[in-house]
Structures are given as C-alpha cells and as structure tokens.
C-alpha cells in the first residue's frame, strides 16, 4: 500500500480552509487528497490528476469508500498535471487556493503493473504511465543511439556507469532484442563491476529511474506545470512541490527563485522541508522527500 509523505507538513503549509478549492496534481492513492478534503469540508473541492488510469481508478475507490460527501467534492482527471490549465478551464474549476504535486513514484506501481516499472519483477519493458504515450522503454533501449541512451542514464539517473551500461545495451541488442525487465537487469549487471553490485542502492535503480523519466517526459512535464500552476492560483494561493531527486528539486528551487525576482510571490520554505525520523521509520522512502512551498502575491 502506498503511504503518502509529509502529509502533516503539506497541510500546515497549504492551510486548507472550509470552502476552499485545491488541486492534487499527483493523486496516487489519494492520501494527500483525503487530508485536504478533511480540512476544506463541507463544500471545498479537490481536482485530482493522475495520468495512470489504473491509479486513478484506485483513488476513486479509496475516496468513495470514505464516509461523507468526499466523492462528490472530488473531480478526477485522467491526464498529466502538465495539462493543469486546460483542465481547470474546461471544468470551470476555481478559485484555486492551493496546488500540490508529489513527484515521487507510487509504490502501488511497483507491484504487478505489467508495465516494467520495477526490476524486482520480470515484466515487459514499457514504463508508460499512460497508453496514450507512444514511447515505451523498449523503444529507447532497442532503437536509440548509444550516445542518446548514455545521456539519459547519466543525466536522469545520475549513474556513473552510464557509458558502460549504454555500451552493454547496444552490444546485447545486436544479438537479441531486449524486451523484458529481467533481460535489461542482466545487461546492466554485465556492465557494472561485481564488487559494486551490493551497495545500499540496487545497481539497476538509477538506470530504471532514468528510463522512466525519459519515457514519461517527467522533467519536461514539471517545467510546463510550474508556470501554469502559478498562473491559475488565486492571489495568496500556495504551490507545494514534493521532489525525490536532485534534478526535480533543482528545477523547483530555481523556478521559485525566478518567481520571487519577478515579484510574483514569496518562498515559504527557506530550506526544503524533510521528513522526521518517526516518519522515516514508518515509511523509508520519505527519507528522500523534499517539500518546497511558494505563495503567490
């Protein structure tokens, strides 16, 4: 079961009040959405985005199983948060008092998704959140040039062995098309020295992360989302972003600084908010989470 991170901190900074409207750009298992709905009762609404239709269906069930009018106060959108403005306009949703995105990867998707998000299960190399996306991971692995593969593994995965891994991929695919997570895992293992394969972070983690980011254009979506979020926010509205790796955090930090320079608002978190030891004990993945919050002028 996916456990949402930094829920208390998110609620503290978004400060939902009765009747206010919010956007949860990454619905997942609806953990943050439910926390907001508890605070903006009785008639505040949440617009809840998820590009993954399976995740959105799970969220609908979770919200629907709760007592009260939560389901009728939630608008579910099967789309990327990058298309925030389009969807808020089409649904005449507003005024918007706060927006949240949690850029972490849902642990529910690491289960038997059948889409190859995890190297712990042997599944087809797909990694698409949405089937409307026409770039599965196998396309990158089997058809992109070596330099292109090396670039995404190095930049998106921050993997020091990116060159060796990309060389191994290109060498292996000449013999056999790489179609499953297990096949890719074996190729990565062949490229990394044995002595480095028992580190705290699994040796395939960075490569799989890089592929997932590339397949779903995660950094591009974030860069499109941020200005749209500030645009649709009401004056005094708050934008909260939870990131899990340095690439995302850098984009958010720099964007917030640019907004301050342009006198569009102020940063409420001088330093990113991180999880306390108690939360990390219950949910180890929260160790990597960083929350930054911006308030529109």
Regions found by a protein language model. Give the residues of each.
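S-adenosyl-L-methionine-dependent methyltransferase catalytic core, i.e., the SAM/SAH-binding region
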Residues: 1-297
